[in-house]
Amino acid sequence: MAQDLKIAATANLTCALKALVKEFQKEHPKDAISISFNSSGKLYAQIIQNAPFDLFISADITRPKKLYDEKITPFKEEAYAKGVLVLWSENLKIDSLEILKDPKIKRIAMANPKLAPYGKASMEVLDHLKLTPGLKSKIIYGASISQAHQFVATKNAQIGFGALSLMDKRDKNLSYFIIDKALYNPIEQALITTKNGANNPLAKVFKDFLFSPKARAIFKEYGYIVD
């Protein structure tokens, strides 16, 4: 019996989740999986409004946990990976965070800290380095991490805070620097089965697959930290 699965996924998973679905469908070729990518905050807001998702794969633990704590879903949140923050550019060489202080840098992209955990982590880095007051006017915010990436990719921003998982290793112009994990709180990413997903057997099958050795290897390949 072919089944349908609707997933709400954080934008930093745009590349990795497509690879994971491709792998999953080798064993489940008849099942249809549709994914809505957005910031964790926006997806959370849609789920509270009863959006018909079966699984919510977030960039934080807070929002999935809230869904359980507020009894919006009977399932508990499960951490699946830790995200890695980078500073990157499409045409400038980046080998340290010193470039943030360069007066030639006029626009810095990051995800909206209120909606996206990677944006929150980016602000923590600037706060930690005491650079926030001086750089505030240069920051342009993307609604999600992938929109912040677009700003850099289209050169609307010279540099940006991004997710290691979205870095295209084949792009020869791209340069990125992995930010010291001591500068931001861990980006612990969790998922949760929604109330809708309770009636969809495929939700459990796909969720279990995400914790399989095969899936863990794919997460690693895309730069996530998996224990």
What are the functions of these language-model segments?
Residues 76-78:
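Active-site acidic carboxylates
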Residues 2-27, 32, 36-37, 41, ...:
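Exported/periplasmic ABC-transporter solute-binding proteins
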